[in-house]
C-alpha cells in the first residue's frame, strides 16, 4: 500500500503526456529503477582522457599547471594502442568474466568510458574505488602494452593520476568523475551534492529540463541519504522532486510556455499562484484592507508548486538574457515576491531565498570568485537549500550562451565527452518516467 495518496501525471521535456496517475512514491530514489541506476552508475563511472595522457607524456608536463620536467619526455602511442590498452585494463578492473564491468573507447580512442564492477563498490566503504582502480589499471596497462621501462613508469603514473598522492586531489590527472573527492564534502551525506553544476549541464548536453531533472534527482537523493527526507519530511522531498525536477502535471512546462515570450519573474509568480488556487492548493485566509493573505492546508504541496515556479522563473529570466549570471537574483526575488505579495512561505521555507543572498555575493559581488556553473549543493554558500536551489542554477547554465568565464566547455569537457554517452545521464527525465515501478 502506498504511504501517500498523492498521484501525478508525468510529462516529457516537450510537454507530452507519458503516464497518468503515478504515485509519488514511484519516483522515490529508494524505489525508482532509473534513479537507482543513475546513482549507482555515477558512483562507478570514470572518464579517462587517453589523448591527454599521450600529450602529457610527450611534453613531460604532468602534475598540473607549472609542472614541467624537461628531459622526461616519452614518445608513447597511447591512442594508436587504445584497443589493446583498454582490453588489458578491463581484465584488471573486472572481478570475474561477464560481470557488469564496462570499458568502452570513444572518440576514435581518445577517450574511455569505464564502469567498475558493482562488486568492487559493494566491497568498498565509499566511491573512491572507481577512479583509483581505474587509474591503477590503465597505468599498468599502458606500461605493459607500450613497453615502458621501469625508470619511466613513474611518468605514466603522473600522466594518469596527476600529482596525487602529494596532493589531495588528482591535480593534473587525466581521469574524471562526476563525484568530487570525499575530502571536500561539507559533511556526512553530501557526496551526491558535490557535483559541479557545469558537469550536470555537460552530461545532459545543455538540455534545460534534462539538466534540471538530473540536478533535482541528485539533490533529493542526497536528502534521503543525509536523513532530511525521513518521516514527516519525506513527502516534501518527493513532491519537490516530482514538480520541480520531473515536470509533474506539466506544471513547469506550462509556466514556461505561458511566460516565455514576454513574461517576467513577477508574471511567473502570478501564474503559480493562480494555478495553485485553481488546484485547491492555496486559498485566501483573510483580507486586510484589500490585501489578500493566502494560506494553505498542505505546505509540502505548495512548496512543490512554488519550486516548479522558481525553475520556470529562472528559465524565463535567464533564458531572455541568454546569460546565467543573474540566477541568484531570480531565486531571491521570486521568493521575495511570493512572500510580500501573497503572505505565503517561499520555496524551502526561506532557505532558497537565504541561499540566494549569499550566492549573489559569492558569484558576482565584491567577492566575485566564480560564476554559477562552478557551484554545487556541497558549497558552503549553496548547501543550505534542501535540494531546491541548485536545479535553478543548472537551468541557468544550460541556457547560457557563452557569457561565463567558467563555462561547461571549459570545466567539464571530459565529462561531456564521456558521461553524455550514458543514456540515463543524458536524458534522465525520459528514463525516470519510463522505469517507474508500477
Curated annotation (Swiss-Prot):
Keywords from the UniProt entry: Cytoplasm, Methanogenesis, Transferase
Catalytic activity, reaction form: coenzyme B + methyl-coenzyme M = methane + coenzyme M-coenzyme B heterodisulfide
Gene Ontology cellular component list: cytoplasm
Positions bound to coenzyme B: 369
GO biological process: methanogenesis
Gene3D superfamilies assigned: 3.30.70.470, Methyl-coenzyme M reductase, alpha/beta subunit, C-terminal
Required co-factors: coenzyme F430
Complex formation: MCR is a hexamer of two alpha, two beta, and two gamma chains, forming a dimer of heterotrimers.
Protein name: Methyl-coenzyme M reductase subunit beta
Taxonomic path: Archaea, Methanobacteriati, Methanobacteriota, Methanomada group, Methanobacteria
Gene: mcrB
Amino acid at each position: 500500500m502506498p504511504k501517500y495518496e498523492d498521484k501525478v501525471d508525468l510529462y516529457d521535456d516537450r510537454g507530452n503526456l507519458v503516464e497518468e496517475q503515478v504515485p509519488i512514491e514511484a519516483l522515490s530514489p529508494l524505489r525508482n529503477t532509473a534513479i537507482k541506476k543513475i546513482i549507482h552508475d555515477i558512483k562507478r563511472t570514470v572518464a579517462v582522457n587517453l589523448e591527454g595522457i599521450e600529450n602529457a607524456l610527450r611534453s613531460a608536463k604532468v602534475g598540473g599547471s607549472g609542472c614541467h620536467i624537461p628531459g622526461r619526455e616519452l614518445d608513447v602511442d597511447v591512442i594508436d594502442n587504445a584497443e589493446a590498452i583498454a582490453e588489458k585494463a578491463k581484465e584488471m578492473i573486472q572481478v570475474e568474466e561477464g560481470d557488469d564491468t564496462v570499458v568502452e573507447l570513444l572518440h576514435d580512442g581518445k577517450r574511455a568510458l569505464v564502469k567498475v564492477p558493482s562488486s568492487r563498490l559493494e566491497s568498498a566503504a565509499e566511491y573512491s574505488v572507481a577512479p583509483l582502480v581505474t587509474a591503477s589499471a590503465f597505468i599498468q596497462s599502458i606500461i605493459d602494452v607500450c613497453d615502458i621501462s621501469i625508470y619511466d613508469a613513474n611518468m605514466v603514473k603522473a600522466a594518469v593520476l596527476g600529482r596525487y598522492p602529494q596532493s589531495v586531489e588528482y591535480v593534473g590527472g587525466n581521469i574524471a568523475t562526476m563525484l568530487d573527492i570525499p575530502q571536500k564534502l561539507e559533511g556526512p551525506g553530501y557526496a551526491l551534492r558535490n557535483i559541479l553544476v557545469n558537469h550536470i549541464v555537460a552530461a545532459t548536453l545543455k538540455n534545460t529540463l534534462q539538466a534540471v531533472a538530473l540536478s533535482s534527482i541528485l539533490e533529493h537523493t542526497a536528502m534521503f541519504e543525509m536523513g532530511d527526507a525521513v518521516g514527516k519530511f519525506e513527502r516534501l522531498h518527493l513532491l519537490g522532486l516530482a514538480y520541480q525536477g520531473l515536470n509533474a502535471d506539466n506544471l513547469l512546462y506550462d509556466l514556461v510556455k505561458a511566460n516565455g515570450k514576454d513574461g517576467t519573474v513577477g508574471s511567473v509568480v502570478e501564474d503559480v499562484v493562480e494555478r495553485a488556487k485553481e488546484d485547491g492548493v492555496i486559498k485566501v485566509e483573510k483580507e486586510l484592507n484589500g490585501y489578500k493573505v493566502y494560506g494553505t492546508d498542505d505546505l509540502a504541496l505548495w512548496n512543490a508548486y512554488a519550486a516548479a515556479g522558481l525553475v520556470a522563473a529562472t528559465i524565463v529570466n535567464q533564458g531572455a538574457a541568454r546569460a546565467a549570471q543573474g540566477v541568484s537574483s531570480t531565486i531571491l526575488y521570486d521568493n521575495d515576491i511570493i512572500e510580500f505579495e501573497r503572505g505565503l512561505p517561499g520555496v524551502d521555507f526561506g532557505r532558497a531565498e537565504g541561499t540566494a543572498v549569499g550566492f549573489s555575493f559569492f558569484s558576482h559581488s565584491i567577492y566575485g570568485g566564480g560564476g554559477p556553473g562552478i557551484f554545487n549543493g556541497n558549497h558552503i554558500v549553496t548547501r543550505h537549500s534542501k535540494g531546491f536551489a541548485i536545479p535553478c542554477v543548472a537551468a541557468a547554465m544550460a541556457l547560457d550562451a557563452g557569457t561565463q568565464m567558467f563555462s561547461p566547455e571549459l570545466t567539464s569537457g571530459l565529462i561531456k565527452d564521456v558521461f553524455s554517452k550514458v543514456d540515463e545521464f543524458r536524458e534522465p527525465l525520459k528514463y525516470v518516467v519510463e522505469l517507474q515501478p508500477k
